[in-house]
Each structure stands twice: as structure tokens, then as C-alpha cells.
């Protein structure tokens, strides 16, 4: 019995497929972080013609003069969340947050430090990794006036650990999906103004862990003709809700204290 011969085109495609599989396997073996960084990315290439909302949907920020405090008003907070109107509450965080608590969480869970899906950025030359951040937490490196550190995790293990300290707020509907993406922003007391990163889902929660910062909600490009900017001073344990399709948040130094600012960001659908 003679072996069946494949047509030349099919043979060429088969060879190309084998070569591509071998090439990708080599990349995965020698550059595992290349795949882990993009594994959880929902969109690698954005559509420049896509607009999530139009001007008619910007009514939650029209004529808004201030960010209202809805502490203790559960029903009102739920209504504001459904409409996308920004507000702040000061009774949603159950435990007293502090720099020491965050240090304890990071040191007590090795899996967070070994998470290859996390992102870490720092303007401090001596604090270029999460491990260096822990080791220099009380050193002079974090006593400078102006610096910015950004740490973002996107793993199930990290979300499970952080959920114990930052549980789902009472005004977030139980049938909503909470993103795995969690971010920390650490700023020196004189760190200049900067735009906060866009959260995974539109409904965004920002918790002030320690220190103070002024958060200015500028209207997004879609709502710039309908809305104006509003600001709020964030103090420890304050939780701010906003919709990132309606508002573009900026973090501004408050100049009220010499302590660094630590903020925690999450989002839900």
C-alpha cells in the first residue's frame, strides 16, 4: 500500500502551521510574561469610530454643581449608581484603612508578589518593583514630595485577597459583575495633577486609603458640551463613585498634609 500524498498546497499549509506552533511555543517558553500581560486584556485594538455614549446620555452630569454625600442613604446611592451620577459615601468601608494595613496585606500574601499579570510603574528610581516598595515602605525614598507609583492586579487570587479589605459596597447591586482588575495609586504630597487610568468597567469606585487628594471630575469628550468640572477633597475611608464614560477624573494635590496619598480603584458592570 502506498502512502497517500498530500497536495502541495495542503502540505505547505500543514508545514506552515507546524512552524508557527513551534515558534509560538518557543516564545511562550522563553518569554512567558509576554503572554501573561495580554492574557486578560479584553481589547487589543480599539475601534476609533466607536462611541459608547452621545450627548443625549450626559444628563447625569448636566447642571451638577457639586458631588453629593450620600452616606447613610442606601436607596439614593443605588439610584445614583443606576443613573451614573457621581457621589461620595463615608460609611462603605468597614475597616480602618492605613499604610500599615496595606503593607501587612502585601507582606502576608506571597502570591500577590508573584502575580505575572500585574502592572507596576514608579517614578522613584529606588522603588521599581512591588518587592522594593515593601522593603522601602518606611524609608526616605517615600518621604520625597513628588512621586507617583501605580500598581494594578488582574488575577483571581489577588481579587480574593483584596476583597476581604475592600468588600462590595452596599449600594452596588448584587447582580452586577465586579471586575478582577484592582489598582493602587500612591502619590507624594506634592505630586502634580494627573489623569487617573481608565477602569475596566464604566462604573468606577475610588477609595482613599491614606492621605488626601483632590479629585476633579472633568466631563469626558462625549459630554464636554453638556457638563462642567466638579471637585471633591478625598479623605481616608472616603469612597467616590463615578462613571468613566461621563467623567474623566484627575488627581490633584491637596497640600493639606505631608503624608503620602494611597488610593484604591475598582469597577463594576
What kind of region is each of these model predictions?
Residues 1-241, 245-269:
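N-terminal accessory scaffold of Fe(II)-dependent oxygenases
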Amino acid at each position: 500500500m502506498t502512502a497517500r500524498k498530500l497536495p502541495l498546497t495542503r502540505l505547505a499549509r500543514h508545514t506552515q502551521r507546524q512552524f508557527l506552533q513551534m515558534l509560538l511555543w518557543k516564545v511562550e517558553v522563553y518569554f512567558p510574561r509576554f503572554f501573561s500581560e495580554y492574557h486578560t486584556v479584553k481589547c487589543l485594538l480599539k475601534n476609533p469610530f466607536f462611541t459608547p455614549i452621545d450627548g443625549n446620555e450626559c444628563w447625569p452630569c448636566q447642571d451638577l454643581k457639586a458631588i453629593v454625600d450620600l452616606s447613610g442613604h442606601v436607596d439614593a446611592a443605588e439610584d445614583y449608581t443606576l443613573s451614573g451620577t457621581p457621589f461620595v459615601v463615608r460609611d462603605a468601608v468597614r475597616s480602618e484603612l492605613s499604610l500599615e494595613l496595606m503593607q501587612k496585606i502585601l507582606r502576608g500574601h506571597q502570591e500577590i508578589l508573584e502575580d505575572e499579570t500585574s502592572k507596576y510603574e514608579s517614578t522613584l528610581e529606588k522603588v521599581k518593583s512591588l518587592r522594593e516598595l515593601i522593603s522601602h515602605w518606611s524609608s526616605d525614598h517615600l518621604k520625597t514630595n513628588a512621586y507617583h507609583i501605580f500598581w494594578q492586579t488582574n488575577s483571581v487570587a489577588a481579587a480574593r485577597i483584596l476583597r476581604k479589605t475592600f468588600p462590595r459596597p452596599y449600594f452596588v447591586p448584587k447582580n452586577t459583575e465586579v471586575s478582577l482588575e484592582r489598582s493602587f495609586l500612591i502619590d507624594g504630597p506634592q505630586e502634580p495633577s494627573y489623569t487617573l487610568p481608565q477602569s475596566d468597567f464604566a462604573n468606577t469606585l475610588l477609595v482613599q486609603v491614606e492621605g488626601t487628594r483632590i479629585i476633579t471630575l472633568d466631563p469626558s469628550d462625549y459630554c464636554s458640551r453638556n457638563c462642567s468640572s466638579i471637585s471633591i477633597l478625598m479623605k481616608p475611608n472616603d469612597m467616590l463613585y463615578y462613571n468613566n464614560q461621563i467623567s474623566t477624573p484627575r488627581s490633584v494635590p491637596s497640600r493639606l498634609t505631608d503624608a503620602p496619598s494611597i488610593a484604591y480603584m475598582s469597577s463594576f458592570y
